[in-house]
Structure formats: structure tokens, C-alpha cells
């Protein structure tokens, strides 16, 4: 309303007042969070649980060593960031008993417990398994990220959470998740172009859109490929193909198969995108963009994921958040 220059003048005038000339030592107000002092003791005896293959796989993907000897970081894979009340209470108990009363939220919509004694890992895993949060594959392609979409955001165009649930089935195929180069990829989706689901920095990303079909509006997604936030960040390249929402999982499967079949030895997905070009992916996606006439056999295309009525775009003022 007043403009940046007038605002700057007001600040400079205020700083000439006597209160601004007084010396001030902020040391007494500084808060140092000494996590190590609250860390669980390494001398405590924990239960010894059978080392199953499932537990070993979880150890390899969800647990990292801390610099402090004897302590681990446990990454809890939270599907699409959703927790029910029982899970929330048990996670709080894990935090208090095994992690010094702390937990961190990651950009992958997961939880990270630091300062977990190595000897306590089996107990922690056993509790996580009892509340269905012991899945392996944290920060891998199976760790799909989605914003709330139309589930709760008024700016959402599509049900990105519904798509995320459907996507997990595709990327969890053994032939894909066991491929080292595919496993390290990331799939993210947003229910609108605002990008709260971080689709623009994913290896394969989507944002919600609307397609005009013969029978009316169809929920759809714009496709982005080749993004990355590992090391140097790069924004994904937008393809020219808009995919109906119900065809997106199949389209992702086709893109991954295309990459796996045509990559060079050790070639990561971003490098493959640079070499093959976006146009080659548009050819792969061409078979998934058709918008059929509306009839009893095609009605599913006109209904969004996790919905039961024909799609209609409805947007309003709202706040976006992962």
C-alpha cells in the first residue's frame, strides 16, 4: 500500500530512536537444544527379537548410522504422510522411550527418530510392525509423495492422494523395486500446479489438470520427467502429453519399462532423459492420452481416484500444504 521506499524510510526513522541505540546482548535468550543429553542410555538391555528377512530389509533401507557411536536414525515410512490416532500414539511412545522424546518430519512425508540405540532397533521395528508402519523402502521409488489434493485443499484440482495410493501398487512390483537404478528414483504428485507435492523435482512428477473429453471433464495430469534434488537440484522437464488420472499408473509403468529396456550400463534416469529426450517419452505416453466417449464401459475415466461420482472441477480459496 505504501511502497517499498516509504517502508524503508519508516524503518530508518525508527532505528534513529533512543531504544535502537541501546546495547543488547542476546546470549541469555539463546536456546540450545542439547539432544545428546536426552538420548537414551546405551547401557540399557533391550529385548532380543528374531532377525527375519523382513526386518533385515527394513534395516538396510530405513536405518542410518549417526556420527555418535552406538546410535541410529530410524526413518519411519508413513504412506502419503497419513497417520491414524492409534499410530500417532504409538509413535509418540517410541519417541519418548527410544528417541529422547523427539521426532523429525522429513520432506518425504516420513518421520525420523534420532538417537535410537542400536540395541533397541528390533524393539522399535516390532512396535512399528504392530501399527503397520514397518514398511521398508524409505526414500526409494516406493516412497511416493503426494499433497492432500481435493481431499482437503480447496485449490486442489484432482485427487492426488487417491492417485498416490494407486501408484504405490505399480512401483512396488518386485521387478521394479529390486532394480537398483529404479529403486533410487522418486515419484511425486500435486493436485494442482502449485507444487506442494514437489512434483517438479521428482524423477517422475505429476500435477493435477482437467482434460476436455466428449462426455465432459476428465481428471488428468501433466507429466514432468528428469527432476532431481540429490546434490544439484534440477527442475523436471514437462512433456507435451496430458494423461487421464486413471491411466497414470499404467503410464508410469510404461515409462519405467522404457527406461529399463533402453538405458546404458549404470545410466541413471535423469541422464537417460537428457540422452533420449522428452520427445521419446511423449511417444511412450501417446497410448495413454485418449479420451473416450462417455458410456457404461468408460465411465471410470470420468471418475477420479477414490471417488464415486462423475468428475467436475470445483476450486476455491485455500491453503496448500504437504
Would you name each region that the model predicts?
Residues 1-322:
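Peripheral terminal and linker regions in Fe-S/redox and tRNA-modifying enzymes
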Amino acid at each position: 500500500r505504501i511502497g517499498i521506499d516509504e517502508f524503508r524510510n519508516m524503518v530508518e526513522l525508527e532505528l534513529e530512536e533512543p531504544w535502537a541505540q541501546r546495547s543488547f546482548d542476546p546470549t541469555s535468550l539463546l536456546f540450545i537444544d542439547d539432544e545428546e543429553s536426552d538420548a537414551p542410555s546405551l547401557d540399557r538391555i533391550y529385548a532380543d527379537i528374531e532377525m527375519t528377512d523382513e526386518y533385515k530389509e527394513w534395516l538396510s533401507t530405513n536405518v542410518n548410522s549417526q556420527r555418535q557411536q552406538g546410535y541410529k536414525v530410524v526413518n519411519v515410512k508413513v504412506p502419503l504422510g497419513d497417520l491414524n490416532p492409534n499410530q500417532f500414539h504409538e509413535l509418540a511412545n517410541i519417541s519418548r522411550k527410544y528417541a529422547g522424546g523427539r521426532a523429525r518430519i522429513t520432506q518425504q512425508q516420513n518421520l525420523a527418530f534420532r538417537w535410537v540405540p542400536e540395541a533397541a532397533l528390533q524393539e522399535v521395528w516390532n512396535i512399528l510392525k504392530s501399527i503397520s508402519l514397518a514398511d521398508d523402502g524409505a526414500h526409494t521409488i516406493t516412497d511416493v509423495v503426494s499433497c492432500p489434493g481435493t481431499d482437503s485443499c480447496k485449490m486442489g484440482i484432482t485427487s492426488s492422494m487417491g492417485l498416490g495410493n494407486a501408484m504405490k501398487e505399480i512401483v512396488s512390483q518386485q521387478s521394479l523395486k529390486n532394480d537398483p537404478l529404479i529403486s533410487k528414483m522418486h515419484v511425486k504428485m500435486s493436485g494442482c500446479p502449485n507444487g506442494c507435492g514437489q512434483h517438479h523435482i521428482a524423477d517422475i512428477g505429476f500435477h493435477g489438470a482437467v482434460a476436455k473429453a466428449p462426455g465432459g471433464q476428465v481428471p488428468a495430469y501433466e507429466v514432468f520427467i528428469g527432476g532431481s534434488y540429490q546434490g544439484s537440484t534440477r527442475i523436471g522437464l514437462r512433456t507435451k502429453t496430458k494423461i487421464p488420472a486413471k491411466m497414470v499408473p499404467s503410464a508410469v509403468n510404461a515409462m519405467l519399462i522404457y527406461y529399463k529396456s533402453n538405458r546404458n550400463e549404470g545410466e541413471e534416469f535423469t541422464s537417460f532423459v537428457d540422452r533420449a529426450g522428452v520427445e521419446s517419452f511423449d511417444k511412450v505416453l501417446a497410448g495413454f492420452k485418449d479420451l473416450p466417449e462417455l458410456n457404461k464401459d468408460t465411465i471410470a475415466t470420468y471418475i477420479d481416484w477414490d471417488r464415486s461420482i462423475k468428475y467436475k472441477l470445483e476450486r476455491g480459496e485455500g491453503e496448500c500444504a504437504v
